[in-house]
Amino acid sequence: MFDRATQTLAAIDPEITAAIDAEVRRQEEHIELIASENYTSPAVMAAQGSQLTNKYAEGYPGKRYYGGCEHVDVVEQLAIDRAKQLFGAQNANVQPNSGSQANQAVFFGLLQPGDTIMGLSLAEGGHLTHGMPLNMSGKWFKVVSYGLDAQEDIDYDAMERLAHEHKPKLIIAGASAFALRIDFERFAKVAKAVGAYFMVDMAHYAGLIAAGVYPNPVPFADVVTTTTHKTLRGPRGGLILMTDAVAKQINSAIFPGIQGGPLMHVIAGKAVAFQEALQPEFKAYQEQVVKNATAMAETLTARGLRIVSGRTESHVMLVDLRPKGITGKEAEALLGRAHITCNKNGIPNDPQKPMVTSGIRLGSPAMTTRGFKEEQAVLTANLIADVLEAPNDEAVLERVRAQVAQLTRDFPVYR
């Protein structure tokens, strides 16, 4: 028997408690600008911390390999139905433990080793699961990468030529560091013309898509994968949306293909996040995410920094630091000392090594969750520029830290 009154986390494991408490303070006291991070709601965390973590439930609702699943069946079916409603999908699988595993399931379900796939080059904003040589996707399949044009938009003409030349079995659209809108309809037409499956990895854009402020790929793609955190603001996990034509293959690829028992407590958190995303407030939030990103990009440009592609049309931007003579690694560390968190990131065809880079990636989802509007976004961008323009000036760092402290006090994450 467990005694909730005495067997608390603090009593059982003070070391873990201390680390968690320190991380909570960091999240409250730092401005979070990592584009793939966000703050999830107390309701989502309550679902994740529930006794659903105790339940094994191999299989799918109504078709389990364990008894006692009648209540978790309700939870998973709610998550499925809400995901379908949110994105207008025919089918949804809420069991993937991550976005990478969702992608892996698509490959496992639709492809054979040695098949050809096409995806955006990692060096130009793609994701490692879209064919990076060290990733499973790059080891199991022949990879043809498309890239960006001179304006740093996707080179759709070159993509189409490559597709007709190589006849891939799967064409992937989606990115981890691309700020513009993607023409999913054009991708779909190319895929159909060459007889390929069309997959979209919308992990970065899912929340924007759910709110209608970024194009929805679901009407055009055979299968769409995503994480459930990032802009969607749910728990860490994955989701697959798919047409009737491929649903059986994809579901079988998840279970029993690459996963066993699903994480029912996380699926409950996903269901709660989908419910939150169906509310009008979520649309207003995502609209503000885009406004804040635009305000930051325009301010950084005015301060002499180059935004890759010249602008953002989403939540994310890549900042080319070469005009300031500083690397992404140095900028990440400097801004961290100022209590502004971001990540170093390669720019298209970056001359620097991946652990150094010539750029940083900035995103507005987490700052917008705090309640930041354009005024605070502009101030934050100016603080970033102040630090990058005076990397060796401790007085500037101290001033920026003080301004960040005031901002984070004025806009707490959790009250």
From Swiss-Prot:
Entry cofactors: pyridoxal 5'-phosphate
One Pfam family this sequence matches: SHMT
Pathway: One-carbon metabolism; tetrahydrofolate interconversion; Amino-acid biosynthesis; glycine biosynthesis; glycine from L-serine: step 1/1
GO terms, molecular function: glycine hydroxymethyltransferase activity; pyridoxal phosphate binding
Modified-residue entries (N6-(pyridoxal phosphate)lysine), positions: 230
Chief location: cytoplasm
Keyword entries, A-Z: Amino-acid biosynthesis, Cytoplasm, One-carbon metabolism, Pyridoxal phosphate, Transferase
Reactions this protein catalyses: (6R)-5,10-methylene-5,6,7,8-tetrahydrofolate + glycine + H2O = (6S)-5,6,7,8-tetrahydrofolate + L-serine
Source superkingdom: Bacteria
Quaternary state and interactors: Homodimer.
Protein known as: Serine hydroxymethyltransferase
Organism whose genome encodes this protein: Leptothrix cholodnii (strain ATCC 51168 / LMG 8142 / SP-6)
